């Protein structure tokens, strides 16, 4: 997170951002990229890949994708793969009609919450 924040704030990887990324990659036994990446966009792509691999079972991916603006596209790509029958999901049974819209970036406001707070007159967009 520090590497991502440094990169976003400064528009390019800083020595601190590179050191944070190096620490993660060293722990995993992966080669160091320090000094090889000068573009903020390229550095962010590497951070996205690192977070996907490092935190794959931590239930953070959804929030990362929403923060980066990639959620709807990435989830719809996965739905197509799930329906293709050429992967571990065993074909169309895994996601027969599933398509993600921008509404899925938010959770709906529960009816119980709306019932006790009359100032909540609607719901999140798409719900």
Name what the model sees in each region.
Residues 1-127:
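Acidic/polar-rich alpha-helix caps and helix-coil junctions
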């Amino acid at each position: 997170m520090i590497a991502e924040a440094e990169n976003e704030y400064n528009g390019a990887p800083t020595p601190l951002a590179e050191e944070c990324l190096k620490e993660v990659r060293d722990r995993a036994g992966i080669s160091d990229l320090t000094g090889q990446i000068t573009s903020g966009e390229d550095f962010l792509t590497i951070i996205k890949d690192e977070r996907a691999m490092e935190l794959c079972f931590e239930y953070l991916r959804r929030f990362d994708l929403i923060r980066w603006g990639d959620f709807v596209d990435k989830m719809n790509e996965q739905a197509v793969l799930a329906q293709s029958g050429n992967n571990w999901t065993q074909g169309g049974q895994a996601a027969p009609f599933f398509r993600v819209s921008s509404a899925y970036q938010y959770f709906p406001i529960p009816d119980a919450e709306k019932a006790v707070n009359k100032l909540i007159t609607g719901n999140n967009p798409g719900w």
